Amino acid sequence: MIGIIDYGMGNLHSVSKALERLAIPYFISSDGEELAKAKALILPGVGAFPDAMNILTQTNVQPFLDNWVAENKPLLGICLGMQLLFESSNEHQPTAGLGYLPGRVERFSGTTAEGHAYKVPHMGWNKLEFHRPTPLTEGVPDGYVYFVHSYVVRTETDIVVASSDYYQSVPAIVQKGQVYGMQFHPEKSSTVGMALLKRFGQLVEGN
């Protein structure tokens, strides 16, 4: 059973509907005692990094997640949820993140090295480039996934499982131990996204 964390800033409907289509058991909760019954957690996220961290702190979700990760239980962050897994962000103001993964979150510059402007936010379909085999990506086909974001993670390459290109290399899937992140929206990413969610569900069940 997967617990989807409801902290007021996640696209709960689309994530839950994707799990339903895959016949993956799930529940949605903001309560730590309930979430503790899950085998794995999904941290979705839409909005601003400082607002999300403020809510996670005020609602005591952060200390709950700290214990969850310390116990090496699976946690998947999606979009903003992935960014929150890192050490810090400069969105609006310098803000500390959950710190489960090394790195920081910065805004796309909007300008190439040659001085050409490009559109921010990054919105649309981009091809995934897999860098190394992992259980999460086993059997997942090559293809495109759907991004909507203005901020991008700067991190160590050894935790980057897959990336995409948007005027720079964009970490798209990251993993360290049982902490996973997807910058794109797998629940909106057709075949590839659904295959990744299915694999996450299989890993949770030990398959």
Swiss-Prot record:
GO terms for molecular function: glutaminase activity; imidazoleglycerol-phosphate synthase activity; lyase activity. It holds the Pfam family GATase. GO terms for cellular component: cytoplasm. Gene3D superfamilies: 3.40.50.880. The active site is at C79, H185, E187. InterPro entries: Class_I_gatase-like, GATASE, Imidazole-glycPsynth_HisH. CDD domains: GATase1_IGP_Synthase. GO terms for biological process: L-histidine biosynthetic process. Its EC number is 4.3.2.10, 3.5.1.2. The keyword Translocase does not apply. Residues 1-207 form the Glutamine amidotransferase type-1 domain. PANTHER family: IMIDAZOLE GLYCEROL PHOSPHATE SYNTHASE SUBUNIT HISH (PTHR42701:SF1). Heterodimer of HisH and HisF. IGPS catalyzes the conversion of PRFAR and glutamine to IGP, AICAR and glutamate. The HisH subunit catalyzes the hydrolysis of glutamine to glutamate and ammonia as part of the synthesis of IGP and AICAR. The resulting ammonia molecule is channeled to the active site of HisF. NCBIfam families: IMP_synth_hisH. This is Imidazole glycerol phosphate synthase subunit HisH. The lineage of its organism: Bacteria, Bacillati, Bacillota, Bacilli, Bacillales. The gene is hisH.
